[in-house]
Amino acid sequence: MEFLSGYFLWVKAFHVIAVISWMAALFYLPRLFVYHAENAHKKEFVGVVQIQEKKLYSFIASPAMGFTLITGILMLLIAPEMFKSGGWLHAKLALVVLLLIYHFYCKKCMRELEKDPTGKNARFYRVFNEIPTILMILIVILVVVKPF
């Protein structure tokens, strides 16, 4: 990947853009789940929220996740020495795996809400909504501070 080494900062910039888009979607999607659960008895409202959930997941969250992964892997291929820069990168990658699990669990929640909107209450989704925020904070600290 030496031929791409001159483009590392461009790849990094697009990685940051993709991460911001992915995180925005992961912050908002569970909020839609809250509205869905709170208004399960309002079929018209639920219909609109379901469309929003599907579009957000399919057209924003998933492509942003894919682009985040592609640019992240590309950065590691361009600069494999980053693996030797300390444990912070390994910890960050572990947290990214947790974000991926969260992302796909959101799809599971969408399916569950579609089948039974009363399965989990709005409080569950409010707490669930905090997980990507915590992961993002930890990832940013690891990337910027590189504490180990």
From Swiss-Prot:
Cofactors (names): heme b
Reaction(s) this enzyme catalyzes, per UniProt: protoporphyrinogen IX + 3 A = protoporphyrin IX + 3 AH2
Species annotation: Helicobacter pylori (strain J99 / ATCC 700824)
UniProt protein name: Protoporphyrinogen IX oxidase
EC number(s) per entry: 1.3.99.-
PANTHER family, per database record: PROTOPORPHYRINOGEN IX OXIDASE (PTHR40255:SF1), UPF0093 MEMBRANE PROTEIN SLR1790 (PTHR40255)
NCBIfam families from the UniProt entry: protoporphyrinogen oxidase HemJ
Keyword DNA-binding: no
Keywords on record: Cell membrane, Heme, Iron, Membrane, Metal-binding, Oxidoreductase, Transmembrane, Transmembrane helix
Disulfide cysteine pairs (residue numbers): none
One GO term describing the cellular component: plasma membrane
GO BP terms: protoporphyrinogen IX biosynthetic process
Subunit and interaction comment: Homodimer.
Primary localization: membrane
Transmembrane segments: 7-27, 59-79, 86-106, 128-148
Co-factor binding comment: Binds 1 heme b (iron(II)-protoporphyrin IX) group per subunit.
Residues that coordinate or bind heme: H15, K92
Source superkingdom: Bacteria
First-level EC class: oxidoreductase
